[in-house]
Amino acid sequence: MATCFWLRSCGARRLGSTFPGCRLRPRAGGLVPASGPAPGPAQLRCYAGGLAGLSAALLRTDSFVGGRWLPAAATFPVQDPASGAALGMVADCGVREARAAVRAAYEAFCSWREVSAKERSSLLRKWYNLMIQNKDDLARIITAESGKPLKEAHGEILYSAFFLEWFSEEARRVYGDIIYTPAKDRRALVLKQPIGVAAVITPWNFPSAMITRKVGAALAAGCTVVVKPAEDTPFSALALAELASQAGIPSGVYNVIPCSRKNAKEVGEAICTDPLVSKISFTGSTTTGKILLHHAANSVKRVSMELGGLAPFIVFDSANVDQAVAGALASKFRNTGQTCVCSNRFLVQRGIHDAFVKAFAEAMKKNLHVGNGFEEGTTQGPLINEKAVEKVEKQVNDAVSKGATIVTGGKRHQLGKNFFEPTLLCNVTQDMLCTHEETFGPLAPVIKFDTEEEAIAIANAADVGLAGYFYSQDPAQIWRVAEQLEVGMVGVNEGLISSVECPFGGVKQSGLGREGSKYGIDEYLELKYVCYGGL
């Protein structure tokens, strides 16, 4: 069993006897929960002591395959991005473990697809209930491994759990069709059937929600999954596996294979090219998405891709400045700017430009507080690693060298190497890196424009199109701009747009397919036409 550190000394408690640790085992004729003691407690370390009292059963370090916790031949370290301290050593899965996980998922699929929609719904609901019961501990795991402020981590856990709740309900609403044909002795049926095993590859910035948004839909449809979590944040995926086991999700239905950055490429390729895998779902960079699309093309697998963004945030002269500033803070600085729908380019009309920049700078200084995610009042945690900081630094230096002005921020924060000051730039032009490279950090560059047509042209001058935002009080303009923005999601006078009930996804090179909403489950279903003759 892979090892972790420190938790024994902080008095971690175990889950109560109502939900004892258990594993799952196959049985002839079906898949059932298996009894037996869970492995011993994992131990994590966080310099802020934020994991004291955490449920030890949630702190897993081995892979979860076929309902069993399995070690790997090697381990890799997971670090607290705030302090750089080691949180623990996690199983470093390779190609062999990846193929074993796919086989386990495929064997489980043969039985899981036959489980009634009502029963699948019930199991997903139990999983949701367990997430809610353990929400505080799950949030602290997120903060420990990603650096996200604890308040935001709590928000992510609720968001994550709501996907399980939503798809537990959608599981019972997978309807087909009856089509009356021209021939009197025939009837045509359209069935919806689960596609098979899904390979799920998730990012570090939402280590829980990006799993349940995919896995909830897959399991509701009758598919099984192999999850490869980001190497920076494997603990959240493994904690979800523990709760899935407790909920009674059968062996092999949900599998997790953590791996190091060194093994990530070969493990990703192994699960995406395996002939037993029918579906690939990925959230991450456009560059990596293209590689996975190439893997999928060789065997024509179904894909869902939620890739990079370069979200414009447009402020027209008619906008309410206070509302626009509030929306800008929310859309830019959530998770320290590390979300795919974060505003990356601020386009502000000349007549309101100076007032907006002044108010935005004041709001940033007043409301954004850099610190460790476990500390009360922190709104801006660390970036995930030093490479992310270097990217922000590079964009700031490039912009300044080309004539941009630093209004506030602009440099690394004194707290440590992974912290960067929330930064606002003005006098930004379109030849600067920050206007055509996704930042993924706390940098807000402001471009001044004159006309609506100019703003639309700048906003659409990108090969990606995930989200876009704009503020206006002109009803006619609202309709024009909303329809003309080349993005998959639009926020009108609103900076936070994600919801489990609404479809999430982009256009252009921002991806393929939609997640969440009533449309999300269709990504894991095949249509089958049945012609019934001789009537």
Curated annotation (Swiss-Prot):
Pfam families: Aldedh. GO terms for cellular component: mitochondrion. The modification Phosphoserine is found at residue 499. InterPro entries: Ald_DH/histidinol_DH (IPR016161), Ald_DH_C (IPR016163), Ald_DH_CS_CYS (IPR016160), Ald_DH_CS_GLU (IPR029510), Ald_DH_N (IPR016162), Aldehyde_DH_dom (IPR015590), Aldehyde_DH_Superfamily (IPR050740), Succ_semiAld_DH (IPR010102). Disulfide bonds join 340-342. The modification N6-succinyllysine is found at residues 126, 135, 184, 265, 402. GO terms for biological process: central nervous system development; gamma-aminobutyric acid catabolic process; succinate metabolic process. The keyword Transit peptide applies. It is found in: Mitochondrion. NAD(+) binds at residues 213, 228-231, 284-289. Its EC number is 1.2.1.24. The modification N6-acetyllysine is found at residues 126, 265, 365, 411. The record marks 205 as: Transition state stabilizer. Residues 1-47 form a transit peptide. Belongs to the aldehyde dehydrogenase family. Homotetramer. This is Succinate-semialdehyde dehydrogenase, mitochondrial. It comes from Hylobates lar. The gene is ALDH5A1.
